[in-house]
Amino acid sequence: MNQVENQSKEGYWAVQVDSVSLDSNQVSGSSTAVLDTGTSLIIAPKSAADKIHDAIPGAKSDGHGGYTLPCTTRKKLSFKISGTTHTMDSRDLLFAPKDSNNLKGTCISAVSSGETMDGASWLLGAAFLKNVYFATNSDANRIGLGKLKN
């Protein structure tokens, strides 16, 4: 498990992100991300969220920070944190189908754009966190992130 220093002074758990990529294409450089077990989605800066969805055929913005994409999308979103790349399962880029009777139709994206609570660039909720082992050490003010075994 990779141990990193908590970047937040506000009581959140935050990490320094080296880069964010969709498949092998970088969509964001160095930034900070809050790791939030109470959030389902990923909240990204608008420019990064637009780059992610522009690279997915059939993806569309709803004009209010949300996006839709084909439920058949198999792109992988990766976050490089302290030199270690953590890649999400492609299914976790899909939050939910718009029509539960059509699982091959349009899905709501697990990535939206917006402002985060402490000014961090990203907020990584369950869509990301279910792809890593995540541990916190409040005494040492450190965060552990580990890769899941297949």
Can you annotate each of these PLM segments?
Residues 1-150:
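Active-site or ligand-binding cleft "flap/edge" segments
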